Amino acid sequence: MCGILAVLGCSDPSRAKRVRVLELSRRLKHRGPEWSGLHQHGDCYLAQQRLAIVDPASGDQPLFNEDNPSIVTVNGEIYNHEDLRKQLSNHTFRTGSDCDVIAHLYEEYGEDFVDMLDGIFSFVPLDTRDNSYIVARDAIGVTSLYIGWGLDGSVWISSEMKGLNDDCEHFECFPPGHLYSSKDSGFRRWYNPSWYSEAIPSAPYDPLALRHAFEKAVVKRLMTDVPFGVLLSGGLDSSLVASITSRYLATTKAAEQWGSKLHSFCVGLEGSPDLKAGKEVADYLGTVHHEFTFTVQDGIDAIEDVIYHVETYDVTSIRASTPMFLMSRKIKSLGVKWVISGEGSDEIFGGYLYFHKAPNKEEFHEETCRKIKALHQYDCQRANKSTYAWGLEARVPFLDKAFINVAMNIDPENKMIKRDEGRIEKYILRKAFDDEENPYLPKHILYRQKEQFSDGVGYSWIDGLKAHAAKHVTDKMMLNAGNIFPHNTPNTKEAYYYRMIFERFFPQNSARLTVPGGPTVACSTAKAVEWDAAWSNNLDPSGRAALGVHDSAYENHNKVNKTVEFEKIIPLEAAPVELAIQG
């Protein structure tokens, strides 16, 4: 994939404007370090920084169709591009890139082709005959995208906020599953699945149908001409992804080029739950496993870079992004260009521990719908930007359109967590892969309790962040938090600390409005906090905030903030700085 920047309909076609667009495009170079391209057509500029995954030798982007009326700058992976090429048999393609089909589809079908694409994408095709264009983003928002408007009437599009925040009067997140058309200067939703209305589905649970749908989602993402690996924390989601990948890798074109031995990667503090579980799964599957350890101080030292790259002040996103950011640097240094990861399962199946308190199947289902619709501001943003900070791509099969349709049409009564019946979180997913004759995973891994990524890398990671923030944010500062930050006012010192850093990089009001807010417990939406009255006194995105559910739950709110006791255990000043790489 890539980093894209488009400036459309600007009033200044001068050389200075072209230089400025190039300068802004270079802010995205970490996303695509292998090729820089810029095409100007009148008052429109299309720029691209390319990370080559499919047909890397083709190079040149933005992409054109055969006689040049359509030009496209695109960040994406189109998994059904070979089938689409067959439908476009009257067209001549210049490259073997999967994204080459987009310009041709735009010429052939106009604005009505987006739903034909099976993949993840953000793109801007420009018709040079009349300077019309559309902008589109994938169904769930796996790829990041922003839209802004200049005082001169120009429309700006960028993969990251840093590409447009200094030059736009107003900007915002481009909504997932939508397209923007220059012909009516407005948005419309192209992604219209049945679950989007939040109506309660009634389809019976079919374990084999669910299993086969997910296997297809994983296998289609093995499309590659470059080395890749799998992120393996040892939790259910990443372990299933690794298991399926290792089973089917030998049958793919990727195995012919790079061998059938799968490389897996895990990160954590020394002795963390994820490192232990990840190694156990890797040994079971026979992967070439790489463990990356970091210290609390390593993570703290990276916080400013993480906030700059991930472009958020959301507490849970920063907690989870930091280990992923550190791991991505190491993975890229090994020559790997993309990884397959397990984001999205918890939203689809109600895997977060607070779902234990869902009062009925209706509220359970409505919460999963809310969580999926918000993914682009949380886990998708984290997975996309913390990896792309180092030119590494993350693919997420749980967010496959076809798989989501299967999973979200199951009667939610089957997803409800019922301990007295032995049904833990994500039970129907676990059961679908519980194969006695040809097991995908060891039983205790298949039924391991949910760990949020920021918890699984080591519980002292979050405790260390809180202790560090307490050194930099005083009680007096917290008293004035509402005056300093009236929007999404931070209610903890940790949140205040992140907000200060974010505002230094992105001081515009539009920037702070791109970050979600509201009360949360264990990553819930604000609505789900109402499920348990006790949660309102223990608001924290960590899974350990789900009192009475998590095996290592916080005993009470005061225990969370015992900074002095924590520093007796791990003196932050003495923590080593170097990242250790093992295996």
Swiss-Prot record:
Keywords: Amino-acid biosynthesis, Asparagine biosynthesis, ATP-binding, Glutamine amidotransferase, Ligase, Nucleotide-binding. The record marks 343 as: Important for beta-aspartyl-AMP intermediate formation. Residues 2-185 form the Glutamine amidotransferase type-2 domain. InterPro entries: Asn_synth_AEB, Asn_synthase, Asn_Synthetase, AsnB_N, GATase_2_dom, Ntn_hydrolases_N, Rossmann-like_a/b/a_fold. The keyword Nucleotide-binding applies. Disulfide bonds: none annotated. One of its GO terms (molecular function) is asparagine synthase (glutamine-hydrolyzing) activity. ATP binds at residues 231, 267, 341-342. GO terms for cellular component: cytosol. It comes from the Eukaryota. Roots. Residues 237-516 form the Asparagine synthetase domain. It catalyses: L-aspartate + L-glutamine + ATP + H2O = L-asparagine + L-glutamate + AMP + diphosphate + H(+). The active site is at residue 2. GO terms for biological process: L-asparagine biosynthetic process. PROSITE patterns: GATASE_TYPE_2. Induction: By darkness. Pathway: Amino-acid biosynthesis; L-asparagine biosynthesis; L-asparagine from L-aspartate (L-Gln route): step 1/1. This is Asparagine synthetase, root [glutamine-hydrolyzing]. The gene is AS2.
